[in-house]
Amino acid sequence: MTIAQVRDELGAAIGEYWDNRAQTYSNGIQSELAGYGRCTWQRVLAHAIESTCDAVAREGRTMRALDLGCGPGFFSILLADEGCAVDAVDMSAKMLERARANAAQAVPGASIAFHQCDAADLPFASESFDVAVSRNLTWLMRDPEAAYAEWLRVLRPGGKLLVFDANWYRYLVDDDVDAARRSDQANAQVYDKGSRATDDEERRCELIAAELPLTSVVRPQWDIQVLERLGATRVSVNEQAWQDLWSADEQAYYGSSPLFMIEARK
């Protein structure tokens, strides 16, 4: 089997997994939108794209934003709230169904176009977007360096890339992280069952993660090196982002894989 065939097979498994998770994942997004998450993430997003918004406004046009791996539409909604014309992509048809429904409820009439595609193979012309955002996506990339190159391709010169992610599933290759995870998650009641994966779904995701390249690297150091090698500028990272952005329950449950935030310019 060729490398391309292996990646295609893995991609199909990833798509099937997230189709199955669409409803429970959407439940979590709806909770965020209704509570702690929306204003907290909105504040961080608004601050991160403020200078880009100002520059676009001076040009007299609407800012174009790309939501990469949009899932049930959380960032699509926040970007629309910031006045952006949003394109949102996801490989899961069922996630896109939930995203459309959530957006229709949260930001009726907003300019959001949803597209089913691989986030590493985008159907957009080069230099199309002023900002591109992803959350909990990069770890899933079968060729993450190529994905970063693709995301930079579709950004306009001076455009901004925001990446929120964590060392998800590193516990599969690191015994210390695994011990910390088991301790954090000993009390499973701390996190809402209605938005969590089932035990069977979690095992399936572990099998997927075991085949993904970023499971075994140290991040965000890897990301910084790759982005700079690809020509991104003003690359910075906030490794304490989880303290500002996660709820107390998320911090308790996922503390062994803390969320980081990467900012970069094209």
Language-model-detected regions and their locations in the chain:
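Conserved S-adenosyl-L-methionine
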Residues: A232-D244
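A short acidic, Gly/Pro-enriched loop at the edge of an enzyme's catalytic core
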Residues: A120-V131
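Class I SAM-dependent methyltransferase SAM/SAH-binding core
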Residues: R64-D121
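A short SAM/SAH-binding and catalytic strip from SAM-dependent methyltransferases
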Residues: V131-D143
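Conserved class I S-adenosyl-L-methionine
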Residues: T2-G60, F75-L78, K160-T198, A241
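A short glycine-rich, Lys/Arg-flanked "PGG" loop and its adjoining helix->strand segment in the class I
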Residues: E145-P157
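Short alpha-helix
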Residues: P213-G231
